[in-house]
Every structure is written in C-alpha cells, then in structure tokens.
Amino acid sequence: MGPTKYIIIAVVIIIICVILGLYVVDKKAKEKLSEASKEARRLKEEAERDAEAKKKEAILEAKEEAHKLRAEVERENRERRNEVQRLERRIIQKEEALDKKSEALENKEEALNKKQQKIEDVEAHMEELHEKQRTELERISGLTTEQAKEFLLEQVRKEVKHETAVMIKEIETKAKEEADKRAREVITYAIQRCAADHVAETTVHVVNLPNDEMKGRIIGREGRNIRTLETLTGVDLIIDDTPEAVILSGFDPIRREVARIALEKLIVDGRIHPARIEEMVEKAKKEVEVSIKEEGEQATFETGIHGLHIELIRLLGRLKYRTSYGQNVLKHSIEVSHLAGLMASELGIDPTLAKRVGLLHDIGKAVDHEVEGPHAIIGSEIAKKYRESALVVNAIGAHHGDMEPQSLEAILVQAADAISAARPGARRETLEAYIKRLEKLEEIANECEGVEKSYAIQAGREIRIMVKPEVLDDTGCIEMARNIVKQIESELEYPGQIKVNVIRETRAIEYAK
C-alpha cells in the first residue's frame, strides 16, 4: 500500500472523528438545552411558589394589622364609653348632692326667716321697753335725751383730755429727763475741760496821769489838743474832777484802744500838740493793726485751726476789740470753739470741723457796723468769700436761726454758743433791757385766761403764775404752761432758759362756832 492509501485512510478517519465529535457535541448541547429548560421550569415554578407564598404572607400580615387596628379602635371606644359612663355617674351624683344642698338651704332659709321674725319681735319689744325706760329716766333725772348725751360726752371729753394731758406730761417728763441727762453729761464733760477766764468788757477806759497838771496840757490852748485827739480817734475824752485820771469813752473798742495807746505815748513823751498828736495816733493805729493780726494768729494756734485765709485771721483779731453784752467776742469765739470740739468728740462727730465753725461763728461781728444785716448772715458770706466749705458757711449762718442747719456741727455750735453766753458772769445787759424783758415776761403770762397774778423772779429766769382754781383745772394748767413756753420762745430773746411755773391752789375755809 502506497502513501496515498494511508492518506485517504487518515482523512476518512479524521472525517469519522469529526462526525463523531459533532454528534457528541450536538448530543451534549441537546442535553444541556434540556437541562436548561428543566432548570428554567424549575426556577419558574419556584418563583411562582415564592410569589404565592409572599402574597399569602402579605395578605396574612394585612389581615393581622387590620385585626390589630380593629382591636385598638374597639378598645378606645370601650374606654371612651367607660369614661362617658363615669362622667354621667359623677354628674348624677353632683346633681343629687346639689338637690340635697338646695333642700338644706331652703330649710335653713326657712329657719332663718323664723328667727328673723322672732328677732324683729324681740327688737320691737326692746324698743318699746327702751322708750318706756327713757321716758322714766327723763322724768326721774329731769334731763332730756340730748341733754343727757351732752352731759355724758362732756364727762368723757374731760376724762380723755385729762388722761391725754397726763400722758403727754409723762412722755415729756421722761423724754426731758433722758435728754437732760445725756445733755448734762456731754455739756458737763465739755465745760470741765474748757476753763475760760475772762471778765466783761466796758465802753470806757481810764488812763492814769502822773499829775493833775497833765490835764491842762492834754486840753491845750483853747482846747486844741483835746479836739485834735477826739477828731483823729473818734473817742470822747472826759476830764472831770477825778484826780490824776482821764476817761476815754467810745463804743468802738478799736478806736478806744488807739486813743489809749496814743494818749499814753503822748504822756510819756511830754510833747503834746496837734502835730505830735497826729503822729502818735498813726503809730497807735499801726500797733493796733499788728496786735490784731497777732491776736488772730494766737486764736488759731490756741484752738488748733489751720488753713484760714489771712483776711479771716485779721477779722478774728478784730474780734478782740468787740464785745457782746460786755463779753469779749474773740474770747467768746475761742470758748465756743473749745466747747463745740469737746461736745463733738463726746458724740463721735468730727471735732476739727466743729471747732472751726465755733471759732468763726461770730466773724460777722468784726464788720457788722460796716455792712447791713444780721451778723450770722454777714459771717456766712465772709466765710464763703474766703472759700470755706459749704458746711462751715451754713453752720455760721445758722447759729442764730437765720438759716436752716444742715449738719450736726451747726447744731453743736448753736449749743456751745448758748452755753458760753449763758455762763454766769459771761454777759451783762443794760438795766433798761433787763426791765423790759421782765415786763414782757409778765405781760405774756397775764394775757392768758384764768391768770390771777404772775411774778418774774430769779433775774428773769423763772416766771411764777398764780391761776384761778375755779377757771382752770390741772389739765388746763399743763396746757397753759406749754402755750406760755411756746410764746416766750417765739417773742423773747434771752440767755439760757426760762422756767415757767404754773401754780393752782384751792383752799377750803370753814369756821367752827
């Protein structure tokens, strides 16, 4: 066999193999297709079964949800029905209770009406009895109802008035005792620490002469020397029979001091003529000015007050030559400063401010003859001008009541001023003013109704008033004393205090026969 044979055999075999392979492949493809169809049918059946199951499950869940909703609605309806039934029962109970209360109220109203009727019957009976009793009382007493009411009211009024007066008296006495006790403690302590020793000033000064011949030289030829001296100083020279003495008379202490110094220098010098007199008067004025400044500085040093304007110091020095009722004003101011400071310390108030006001309180008297107005107001304006504080300005202006005090220091200075002025021997007043004050005191007392007589005693520091017992009772005496005190305080000016003593005396006299 040749190669061609083998090739043909090989080709045939290959063809057979290809055919067999195609058959096998086709068979496998058919098998796979059949299996795929089966799988598709199986999956479809499973999907249909799942869908049916889910459908049934959804239907079941919907039925269950509907059942739950129906049960919830039924439960809520049941609860609402129960609530409505409960409210209905409560309303029924309340209606029953209201019916019972209404019935009880009707019963009470009926009972009250019966009681009201009984009360009206009793009142009518009582009114009838009262009218009978009133008629019987009027017949027995001889007084009408209005007269009896008036009598009773008058008795009650007198009793209340008496009790009120007694109560007021007790309160006033207690308050006065407490206030006096504390005031005495403060003032006594202040006074015992402040020893002021000065005498009353006068309006005249006596200059001693070496011999009586000097009188003629002072008078000079045709009186030229004495006229020159009087003209330059403004002081009257009184030359009388008094041996070896010349009297200088003048109300201005500064002028009087200038005249005294000039005259004493002229006497020592021995040369007395108008030109020399003029020279000595000028020297005396300069000496007095220096003395004024020194006195002001000494006053501030003595009281411990610093920072005063130089003009205020000069005005303080001028107060040495001023008097008030014979009391030296500068020494009085120093005394008031010490007293105010001591009382302020006792009361826990700033003593420095109180002392400052006390020292300056009468500063207006240094210029009051040059400026019109009360010295307190003048002093406050001066203090304001030289830049003192508002409290100092107010306290100076208020120490005599010309201004309303705005600080405790102002009130303390008022008290210290009164203490210094009222100290025995500190001041004096003219006989005429003293007599007028006593007459005015008795006049105020005699103007009151029921006064029989009055006497001003103790140098005008006490007024004793005898009243008619048939006109005034004890309560009226208390009221009279209070009214007289108010009138004295408003109409009189006086140092210290005045005691008003109202005396009511009843005497019963019988004779045994």
UniProtKB/Swiss-Prot annotation:
The keyword Nuclease applies. Its EC number is 3.1.-.-. It holds the Pfam family KH_1. Keywords: Cell membrane, Endonuclease, Hydrolase, Membrane, Nuclease, RNA-binding, Transmembrane, Transmembrane helix. GO terms for cellular component: plasma membrane. It is found in: Cell membrane. One of its GO terms (molecular function) is RNA endonuclease activity. The lineage of its organism: Bacteria, Bacillati, Bacillota, Clostridia, Eubacteriales. Residues 203-288 form the KH domain. Residues 329-422 form the HD domain. SUPFAM superfamilies: Eukaryotic type KH-domain (KH-domain type I) (SSF54791), HD-domain/PDEase-like (SSF109604). This is Ribonuclease Y. The chain crosses the membrane at residues 6-26. Disulfide bonds: none annotated. The keyword RNA-binding applies. The gene is rny. One of its GO terms (biological process) is mRNA catabolic process. It is a single-pass membrane protein. It comes from the Bacteria.
